[in-house]
Regions:
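Short hydrophobic/aromatic-rich beta-strand segments that constitute the beta-sheet cores
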Residues: 55, 85-87, 126
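Short beta-strand His + acidic residue motifs that chelate non-heme Fe in jelly-roll/DSBH
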Residues: 64-66, 85-87, 108, 114-120
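Short, well-structured hydrophobic secondary-structure segments
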Residues: 56-64
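A generic "binding-loop/recognition-motif" signal
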Residues: 51, 60, 71, 112-113, ...
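Glycine- and acidic-residue-biased ligand/ion/polar-headgroup-sensing regions
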Residues: 71-89
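Short acidic-glycine-tyrosine-enriched beta hairpin
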Residues: 90-109
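A short, N-terminal "cap"/entry segment at the start of jelly-roll beta-barrel domains
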Residues: 1-52, 65, 98, 142-161
């Protein structure tokens, strides 16, 4: 900690990645180390008032699952692995398709249906930035099923169900 700010920048710090939500405090870190060392489906690393960053590990043959965020723009960056990103105006008609691999970035506009599919034989490691925030502070989803269940619960609460 320097001047009450968390700093992760040395090789020693990189080896000691701590998976927790550091927001909304200032935070500097090795984003590639956090992304590639993450073993969970989704973990929030920083949650602020208007933006959130998560790391994800999508297993070989897995995917994020078709989803759409009506009021959230999303940015994805691939740090390891490869796959296919699909987008479209309807869940059953995602007519935009592109291959992604290490160092590729994806911008997903609010209101677009999308899915990221890992068609390789190794985990697909990505980080995601949401604006505004999509998941509660300190979110950790060990598996996709856990992420889907939490999403359904969060949105049921938001809509008074």
């Amino acid at each position: 900690t320097q001047n009450n700010q968390t700093v992760e920048s040395t090789p020693e710090a990189t080896a000691q990645v701590e998976f927790k939500d550091f927001g909304p405090e200032p935070f500097v870190f090795d984003i590639e180390a956090y992304t590639t060392q993450n073993e969970t489906y989704r973990t929030s690393i920083w949650t602020g008032t208007y933006m959130q960053m998560t790391v994800m590990s999508i297993p070989a043959g897995g995917d994020i699952g078709a989803e759409m965020h009506p009021d959230i723009d999303q940015f994805l960056r691939v740090e390891a692995g490869s796959g296919v990103v699909m987008m479209g105006d309807e869940e059953n008609n995602m007519d935009f398709e592109a291959r992604v691999e290490h160092d590729f970035a994806v911008f997903i506009p609010a209101g677009k249906w999308h899915n990221l599919i890992n068609d390789s034989d190794e985990p697909l490691k990505v980080y995601s930035i949401y604006s505004p925030v999509e998941h509660p502070h300190s979110t950790i989803h060990q598996t996709q099923a856990e992420g889907i269940a939490a999403h359904e619960t969060e949105h049921a609460i938001e809509h008074g169900h």
